[in-house]
UniProtKB/Swiss-Prot annotation:
Cofactor note (record): Binds 1 Mg(2+) ion per subunit.
Family statement: Belongs to the RNA polymerase beta' chain family.
Gene from which the chain derives: rpoC
GO molecular function: DNA binding; DNA-directed RNA polymerase activity; magnesium ion binding; zinc ion binding
Gene Ontology terms: cellular component: DNA-directed RNA polymerase complex
Catalytic EC class: transferase
Record: residues binding Zn(2+) 1: 60, 62, 75, 78
Organism: Mycobacterium sp. (strain KMS)
Protein name per its UniProtKB record: DNA-directed RNA polymerase subunit beta'
Function summary: DNA-dependent RNA polymerase catalyzes the transcription of DNA into RNA using the four ribonucleoside triphosphates as substrates.
Length: 1315
């Protein structure tokens, strides 16, 4: 199958001026857009038809040619080509600049690429580009060296002349002063007059001296500057530069602005520079080496690929097609235009003015100013606001530049390429459809008609209800009666997709078979609400229609709701009875002592009662009113399987349908068991929600999905039926306040008063008082709760609802009827005054306000949490999107050890509580062997519940399982390492996008995690929990309360100072001691297991193992990586993330977290490059690193040395090989800048890249191995296809040609291209 846009990779690079001119269809010379009278584009303007193509199909500008027959002609009057108007979306123009400008991305990005290339500081670069300083581009060293002595002599002569002049002037002035004084003396002037004259004379002489000295200093400065003149040197002083040019102009050239940068790049020798930098890296140290490494990255980029650094300085600016920056007329004659037109107009205006000034031969200062303005306008066009104040439009709004069009949520990448709107879709409010089967949904008639319109129209024409498509369309629009019959027919067997936003995991979109319903609301099956997280308080859902046969097949086979009963996160069923259904089944299976028609054994005076020969007889008795559903009876059963223990006792060969046995149970329970599959053992207990969950779990593990779907549907129907009959309602009368409440409160109030008195006397400090009060009132609340529980009758509806597990919990009941108890303030501390009223009695004003405090915090928290959790999911999806199952088995021997059970001192095994999320659904990596060496289960076997039970029975407590952490696949993971797909219960299929499933499984419960950081005991010691902790782990940040870990195994020496601990570890192997000092006493020492088995705080002389934590808090994952290596840090991260989710009662399988952690440790940082191409300090994929090293070693070279790095998910997503994926994630401009300089090529292997370019994603059924399937007929089919029909068919058909009628052996013919 061929793709429409079939290309293998996508490359990005720097465009040179020649490229830009080649793309262009003409130069834009005028800033005009359209003529305000005729509303036609101006010639040579930004919308010119001559450059960009005609505005109307097949019409030139002047109207000489109108019609398709002139296609391709260029009109000789107006120069417009006669073609489609669509070309205005793809034809580009350009602006020839009168002076070169630099591209702001490469100059202003951090780090400045231009600065690194030319070895100039960004500040200096800015001065040069924006005409604040001159830069020396070239010095003629040889000439200067040869003539230096002559020039020096000239300089000496000049200085001598200045000095002589100075001496002569001073001499003359001194003589004049003498003469003046003599004259004054002769006139007999006063002494102060004489003094003034003398002072004046001396002052003038001082000025003469200073002026001469300044002149000499300037000559010195000019000379020293000249002798030390070197390329890339900045001269900020304009006067100094002028003097240099006047005197020594022939020895050097200098310039300012982008032209000087262009010259520097032209003269730049990339090869030599790269060699120098490599040398510096080999021999250098410290800062110098770091700088060289960073520069080499940029220099080497230009050295290896076809990019020319000249692309960073532009001589021409491309103009994007006019349809991509449209101008639209609003009503009222005004125009709305894209900001780009404004930005382009500024560039053109300034460029034209600059051309004119140059032609006029204007003074350099004016020309330079205009060039600076041109540079600024091009900067604003590419990235407005990156440098200086942004250019604003009307209303002081910054204009959106080309970069802004790509960036952020509203940018091209995320808004248009990754989030397109879809045709054949609709949305409406949802209501419950309890009569539906699990795989059905109710679709409003009108909606269905609109969605299936083309199908209906075609069918109407086929059935001759309409002559042509047009009349069929009219029929549909007028909703003629025949249309509905046809719609029924078209809609059959055509699944539709339902989606509820926010789609947090893949079960947010499921396929259903539509059933037409009246009204305008979509009807949704009650059991799928859990997966969609939908309720019927006004939620809306969207409907999408899969069109192609493949899409319909996928929807039916993979997405049908009855095939998606299990959660992809934990493998537990999601389609479970909830709420009313649970209540109904709980009611049905309750047994009530002494109810009507109860079984009574035979006594002397009366026969036995309540014994029935079959369930049917019991039901008849119930219908007569002689028996209650919940009464205990004895009944003979033939169609229900006895419980396992009983079956073994009664039937040696096992039970078969039809064999009779007697059960002591209730009619309700018999009816419940009739809903289950026939071979499922009888369950004789009350159906709490947990029990129902256990049963469905069991069914999912043992029966095909179809059976499970049918069973849950039956349970739903029975649940609703009996919930209605049970008459469970809630009214005010059901909320009973316990009578002993007041007495309990008075007792505790007295205790609290005692504490308060102690506090007033100063016997307690504030904290102690608060803690005591909190303790007292917590006890009080608990006691009221107990009293409440004893006071309520068992058949109270509220208690029934809570006890059955339908909804609510006991705390809520206590709040309603008992007392609310203590509440927290926004800091999370308890307010020591309790709320003594219940909601039934009503709160006092003070209590009400205390209560609102915490409640509002809760609401604000939820809103923040939703946003944070969504962002976490987005980062997780981005980092893991290219983890796809690529092969069946990577053949690795490695795996990880998981615990199945805890071995007790007496040798018995207690099943580990976390088996469900660790060992379950994995593949064994080695044979599981019991104590006697017998193989219980061989390697490669899948660990389901039965297998785990078998291992525990054999006394095995540890097994080694395959894991994605140890998978050896180069790209993606293999099916055996991943193990069973949680959603299907079978080995994962090749092509499954396990990365995205993992991200969704971790992100979806994110909203349930708390935002808060808890305060637990101790001073100032916060335990970060909830969402912040998960983010901290996945971003690989240093934790907030970092705890040191032991670098080596050894004995601890602990010293206590005033404010700090100092811990020294003496290693067991006699190595160097490891010292940890300055450990703050605000963190407590860790509780560890001592060698004698007791637990206690770490103390002097204890023994610690490598990697043990020494203080309370969280270990820094980077430290764990350094001390214990990559495998340990992976296990550490998985464990820590699980801790957070388990604390919230969320069940996620370890394998999902492992997929993400695997992505965090994919890279290696190069320490020494050896004979490879890698740059030291660069990050490389582990697979690439290993294959390159193998290649070099095979050639006899020195391999590279590297160490694994742990990257946070954001950093890992940005470091991906695919620049398209990284650019559409975050920091778009930075990613594109880097990719362009390195001339990066995108192999299009991940999902996002393919979505962006509009190809099918390489996952699921879009993976190559499924799309390149060819159907080859079998021998029989070929024989059938190629025989000649015989005459007995009553058809006369002559023989064609000389063939015998035998099958043609197609295998002998090549299928290659016949050319």
């Amino acid at each position: 199958m061929l793709d429409v846009n079939f290309f293998d990779e996508l490359r990005i690079g720097l465009a040179t001026a020649d490229d830009i001119r080649q793309w262009s269809y003409g130069e834009v010379k005028k800033p005009e857009t359209i003529n305000y009278r005729t509303l036609k584009p101006e010639k040579d303007g930004l919308f010119c038809e001559k450059i960009f193509g005609p505005t109307r199909d097949w019409e030139c500008y002047c109207g000489k040619y109108k019609r398709v027959r002139f296609k391709g002609i260029i009109c000789e009057r107006c120069g417009v080509e006669v073609t489609r108007a669509k070309v205005r979306r793809e034809r580009m123009g350009h602006i020839e600049l009168a002076a070169p400008v630099t591209h702001i991305w490469y100059f202003k990005g951090v780090p400045s690429r231009l600065g690194y290339l030319l070895d100039l500081a960004p500040k200096d670069l800015e001065k040069i580009i924006y005409f604040a300083a001159y830069v020396i581009t070239d010095v003629n060293d040889e000439m200067r060296h040869n003539e230096l002595s002559t020039l020096e002599a000239e300089m000496v002569v000049e200085k001598k002349a200045v000095e002589d002049q100075r001496d002569a002037d001073l001499e003359a002035r001194a003589q004049k002063l003498e003469a003046d004084l003599a004259e004054l003396e002769a006139e007999g002037a006063k002494s102060d007059v004489r003094r003034k004259v003398r002072d004046g004379g001396e002052r003038e002489m001082r000025q003469l001296r200073d002026r001469a000295q300044r002149e000499l200093d300037r000559l010195d400065e000019i000379w020293t500057t000249f002798t030390k003149l070197a390329p890339k040197q900045l001269i900020v002083d304009e006067v100094l530069y002028r003097e240099l040019v006047d005197r020594y102009g022939e020895y050097f050239t200098g310039a300012m602005g982008a032209e000087s940068i262009k010259k520097l790049i032209e003269n730049f020798d990339i090869e030599a520079e790269a060699e120098n930098l490599r040398e510096t890296i080999r021999s250098g140290k410290g800062q110098k080496k770091l700088r060289a490494l960073k520069r080499l990255k940029v220099v080497a980029a230009f050295q290896t690929n076809r990019n020319s650094p000249m692309g960073m300085v532009l001589d021409a600016v491309p103009v994007i097609p006019p349809e991509l920056r449209p101008m639209v007329q609003l009503d009222g004659g005004r125009f709305a235009t894209s900001d780009l037109n404004d930005l382009y107009r500024r560039v053109i205006n300034r460029n034209n003015r600059l051309k004119r000034l140059i032609d006029l031969g204007a003074p350099e200062i004016i020309v330079n100013n205009e060039k600076r303005m041109l540079q600024e306008s091009v900067d604003a066009l590419f990235d407005n606001g990156r440098r200086g104040r942004p250019v604003t439009g009307p209303g002081n709004r910054p204009l959106k530049s080309l970069s802004d069009l790509l960036k952020g949520k509203q940018g091209r990448f995320r808004q248009n390429l990754l989030g397109k709107r879809v045709d054949y879709s609709g949305r409406s409010v949802i209501v419950v459809g309890p009569q539906l089967k699990l795989h059905q949904c109710g679709l409003p008639k009108l909606m269905a008609l609109e969605l299936f319109k083309p199908f209906v129209m075609k069918r109407l024409v086929d059935l001759n209800h309409a002559q042509n498509i047009k009349s069929a369309k009219r029929m549909v629009e007028r909703q003629r009666p025949q249309v509905w019959d046809v719609l029924e027919e078209v809609i059959a067997e055509h699944p539709v997709l339902l989606n509820r936003a926010p789609t947090l995991h893949r079960l947010g979109i499921q396929a259903f078979e539509p059933q037409l319903v009246e009204g305008k609301a979509i009807q949704l099956h009650p059991l799928v609400c859990e997966a969609f997280n939908a309720d019927f308080d006004g939620d809306q859902m969207a409907v999408h229609l899969p069109l192609s046969a493949e899409a319909q097949a996928e929807a039916r086979i993979l997405m049908l709701s009855s095939n998606n009963i299990l959660s992809p996160a934990s493998g537990k069923p999601l389609a479970m009875p909830r709420l009313d259904m649970v209540t109904g089944l709980y009611f049905l299976t309750t047994m009530i002592e002494g109810d009507k028609g109860e079984y009574r054994p035979a006594a002397t005076d009366q026969p036995e009662e309540g014994v029935y020969s079959s369930p049917a007889e019991a039901i008849m008795a119930m219908d007569r009113g002689a028996l209650s559903v919940r009464a205990k009876i004895k009944v003979r059963l033939t169609q229900l399987r006895p419980p396992a223990a009983l079956e073994a006792e009664l039937f040696e060969n096992g039970w078969k349908p039809g064999l009779a046995w007697t059960a002591e149970t209730t009619l309700g329970r018999v009816m419940f068991n009739e809903l289950l599959p026939i071979s499922y053992p009888f369950i004789n207990e009350q159906m709490h929600k947990k029990v129902q969950a256990r049963i469905i779990n069991d069914l999912a593990e043992r029966f095909p999905m179809i059976v499970v779907a049918q069973t849950v549907d039956k349970l739903k129907d029975a649940g609703f039926h009996w919930a209605t009959r049970s008459g469970v309602t809630v009214s005010m009368a059901d909320v009973l306040v316990p009578p002993q409440k007041q007495e309990i409160l008075d007792r505790y109030e007295a205790e609290a008063d005692g504490i308060e008195r102690k506090y007033q006397r100063g016997a307690l400090n504030h904290k102690e008082r608060n803690d005591s009060l909190v303790k007292i009132w917590q006890d009080a609340t608990e006691e009221v709760g107990k009293a409440l529980e004893e006071h309520y009758p068992a058949d109270n509806p509220i208690i029934t609802i809570v006890k059955s597990g339908a909804t609510g919990n006991f705390t809520q009941t206590r709040t309603l009827a008992g007392m609310k108890g203590l509440v927290t303030n926004p800091k999370g501390e308890f307010i020591p005054r309790p709320i003594k009223s219940s909601f039934r009695e009503g709160l006092t004003v003070l209590e009400y306000f205390i209560n609102t405090h915490g409640a509002r915090k809760g609401l604000a928290d939820t809103a923040l949490r939703t946003a944070d959790s969504g962002y976490l999911t987005r980062r997780l999806v981005d980092v893991s999107q290219d983890v796809i199952v690529r092969e069946h088995d990577c053949e690795t021997e490695r795996g990880i050890n998981v615990t199945l059970a805890e071995r007790q001192p007496d040798g018995s095994l207690i099943r580990d509580p976390h088996v469900e999320t660790s060992a379950f659904a994995r593949t064994l990596a080695t044979d599981a062997v019991d104590a006697d060496g017998n193989v219980v289960i061989e390697r490669g076997h899948d660990l389901g519940d039965p297998a785990i039970d078998k291992l525990l029975a054999a006394g095995i407590d540890h097994v080694k399982v395959r894991s994605v952490l140890t998978c050896a696949s180069a790209t993606g993971v293999c099916a055996m390492c991943y193990g069973r797909s949680m959603a299907t219960g079978k080995l994962v299929d090749i092509g499954e996008a396990v990365g995205i499933v993992a991200a969704q499984s971790i992100g979806e419960p994110g909203t349930q995690l708390t935002m808060r950081t808890f305060h637990q005991g101790g001073v100032g010691e916060d335990i970060t929990g909830g969402l912040p902790r998960v983010q901290e782990l996945f971003e690989a940040r240093v934790p907030r309360n970092k705890a040191p870990i032991a670098d080596v195994s050894g004995r601890v020496q602990l010293e206590e100072g005033e404010r700090f601990y100092k811990i020294t570890i003496v290693p067991d192997d006699g190595g160097e001691e490891v010292v940890y000092d300055k450990l703050s006493k605000r963190q407590r020492l860790r509780v560890i297991k001592h060698e004698d088995g007791s637990e206690g705080v770490l103390s002097d002389g204890d023994h610690v193992e490598v990697g043990d934590q020494l203080m309370e808090g969280s270990a820094d994952p980077h430290e764990v990586l350094r001390v214990q290596g990559p495998r340990e840090v992976q296990i550490h991260l998985v464990h820590e993330v699980q801790e957070v989710y388990r604390a919230q009662g969320v069940s996620i399988h370890d394998k999902h977290i492992e997929v993400i952690v695997r992505q965090m440790l994919r890279r290696v940082t190069i320490i020494d490059s050896g004979a490879t191409e890698f740059l030291p300090g660069s990050l490389t994929e582990r697979a690439e690193f290993e294959s390159e090293n193998r290649r070099v070693v095979a050639e006899g070279g020195e391999p590279a040395a590297g160490r694994p790095v742990l990257m946070g998910i954001t950093k890992a997503s940005l470091a991906t090989d695919s620049w398209l994926s990284a650019a559409s994630f975050q920091e778009t401009t930075r990613v594109l800048t880097d990719a362009a300089i390195n001339c990066r090529s995108d192999k299009l292997q991940g999902l996002k890249e393919n979505v962006i370019i509009g190809k099918l994603i390489p996952a699921g059924t879009g993976i190559n191995r499924y799309r390149n399937i060819q159907v080859q007929p079998t021998e029989e089919a070929r024989a059938a296809a190629y025989t000649i029909p015989s005459y007995e068919d009553q058809y006369y058909s002559p023989d064609f040609g000389q063939a015998t009628g035998a099958a043609v052996p197609l295998d002998d013919y090549g299928y290659s291209d016949y050319r």
